[in-house]
């Protein structure tokens, strides 16, 4: 898996939000990290790997019941494989945490900060944000579906930006 992965898929689900429809002012809504999950998918020429990674913290900013901002902090030391078991999983996880990939020892957190949020129909939002991983920040766009007690997003990150200057 030498610098072949070109995308990282983060499916952020189940935020367990309070009833936001009744909000009439700006409210910072903390994400319930124990009820949230991030699923990653890394693709390479010869296949793919997938797993989970823990959310350390997160906040959604709501204004008059609409999403206007937010941020998430991810624990890079928690990256785990779900498609491999035993020694194979440990080897992949060790590689991903190493300096060669995410350098979790020196960069233990990744962060996504919303820079623009555009409301669509039916609780759908087009979000633009800055994603910082391994000390490098690049823009990303994604759709976020926000319902009564759940928010779901699929974020695709091209990891080439991490390795261009590495």
Regions found by a protein language model. Name each.
Residues 1-4:
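Positively charged n-region of N-terminal signal peptides that target proteins for export
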């Amino acid at each position: 898996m030498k610098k072949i992965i070109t995308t990282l898929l983060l499916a952020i689900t189940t935020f367990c939000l309070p009833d936001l429809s009744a909000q009439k002012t700006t409210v910072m809504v903390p994400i319930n990290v124990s009820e949230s999950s991030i699923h990653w998918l890394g693709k390479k020429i010869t296949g793919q790997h997938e797993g989970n990674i823990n959310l350390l913290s997160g906040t959604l900013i709501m204004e008059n019941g609409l999403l206007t901002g937010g941020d998430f902090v991810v624990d890079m030391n928690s990256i785990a494989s779900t498609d491999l078991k035993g020694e194979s999983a440990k080897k992949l996880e060790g590689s991903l945490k190493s300096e060669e990939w995410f350098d979790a020892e020196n960069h233990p957190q990744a962060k996504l900060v919303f820079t623009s949020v555009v409301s669509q129909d039916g609780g759908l939002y087009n979000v633009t944000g800055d994603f910082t991983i391994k000390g490098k920040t690049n823009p990303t766009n994604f759709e976020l579906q926000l319902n009564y007690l759940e928010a779901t997003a699929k974020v695709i990150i091209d990891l080439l930006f991490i390795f261009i200057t590495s």
